[in-house]
Amino acid sequence: MRIFSETEIRIIGCLIEKEITTPEQYPLTLNALTTACNQKSNRDPVTSLTDSDVLDSVNTLIQERIITDETRGNSRVAKYQHRFCNTEFGSLKLSKQELAVLCVLFLRGPQTPGELRTRTQRLCEFDNVAQVENVLNGLSADEHSPKVIKLAKEPGKREARFAHLFCGEVSQAIATVQQAPSESHDNERIVALESDVADLKLEVEELKKLINNLLDK
């Protein structure tokens, strides 16, 4: 599986998103693509890429035929579309649901199945979270080339997050961090809880005294 840079995967995610959500504006000009990459909504992290940054990555992806220049006729403005998957000669074939899940992971980073169900609504339909989990399990099932990885649960969270693996070991590093939370962090939480319990005990004792005084009167 080809390993992409963070900028490349942001560009691919934006092209996938805009192809589905605003087909009348697709393919995208360089200016529109840069704007999409730097959106403040539906992006994590928020970036401040320049046209030059985007164009450098676009040119690399064009050389590898992952993006094509769709400039037509006498137009002087280049327009770009992705060929990330489901192409005639490409090996990567994805369903609408699989593509939507990967698109959100490309643009927003690690997500829980519940978050993915909510955040893919403009891209495809999921009847329930179980359907999202099935898609994620399918994307992670290929032992030779898994597309996503399940991260360990964060402390206090009910659901584990999933991350894509198209940027290689970056996502693996996240998984390692999540699997080994520091003992000092756990100790701080325990101390805070013990302090809260002690405060509650004092309040209960004060209330008992107040009630006894009222009864004596």
Curated annotation (Swiss-Prot):
HAMAP family: UPF0502. Belongs to the UPF0502 family. Pfam families: DUF480. InterPro entries: DUF480, WH-like_DNA-bd_sf, WH_DNA-bd_sf. This is UPF0502 protein VF_A0604.
